């Protein structure tokens, strides 16, 4: 096998195992970043029902901006 052919075949490393965002168990490659299909579906359900939301102020003049000083 020629040397230039070996250099072209680069293998990428797998992602690091991270804790599942739902239960904390090590993540599974098939369901990444979750550990199982159940945890993946629980997270999807929370997105679809609106459990994950960015809080907004009804009136912009009453909004708290932590970076600004009064």
Curated annotation (Swiss-Prot):
User: Is Zinc included in the keywords of this UniProt record?
Assistant: yes
Q: Which UniProt keywords apply?
A: Metal-binding, Zinc
> Which Pfam family, giving just one, matches this sequence?
YacG
SUPFAM superfamilies from the entry?
Answer: Glucocorticoid receptor-like (DNA-binding domain) (SSF57716)
Matches recorded under InterPro entries: DNA_gyrase_inhibitor_YacG, Znf_NHR/GATA
Name the cofactor(s): Zn(2+)
- Kindly state what the record says about how the cofactor is bound: Binds 1 zinc ion.
| UniProt-recorded Gene Ontology molecular function terms | DNA topoisomerase type II (double strand cut, ATP-hydrolyzing) inhibitor activity; zinc ion binding
> How far does the signal peptide extend, from start to end residue?
none
One biological process term in Gene Ontology? regulation of DNA-templated transcription
The positions annotated for binding Zn(2+) are: 20, 23, 35, 39
Which cysteine-cysteine pairs are annotated as disulfide bonds in the entry? none
**Primary role:** Inhibits all the catalytic activities of DNA gyrase by preventing its interaction with DNA. Acts by binding directly to the C-terminal domain of GyrB, which probably disrupts DNA binding by the gyrase.
**Subunit structure as annotated in this protein's UniProt entry:** Interacts with GyrB.
Q: Which family does it belong to?
A: Belongs to the DNA gyrase inhibitor YacG family.
Cited PANTHER family:
DNA GYRASE INHIBITOR YACG (PTHR36150:SF1)
Q: What is this protein called?
A: DNA gyrase inhibitor YacG
Q: Which organism is it from?
A: Rhizobium etli (strain CIAT 652)
In the UniProt record, the gene name given for this protein reads yacG
């Amino acid at each position: 096998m020629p040397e230039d052919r070996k250099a072209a075949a680069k293998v990428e490393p797998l992602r690091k195992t991270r804790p599942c965002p739902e239960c904390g168990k090590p993540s599974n490659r098939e369901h990444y970043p979750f550990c199982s299909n159940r945890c993946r579906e629980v997270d999807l359900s929370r997105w679809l029902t609106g459990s994950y939301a960015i809080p907004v102020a009804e009136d912009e003049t009453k909004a708290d901006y932590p970076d600004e000083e009064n």
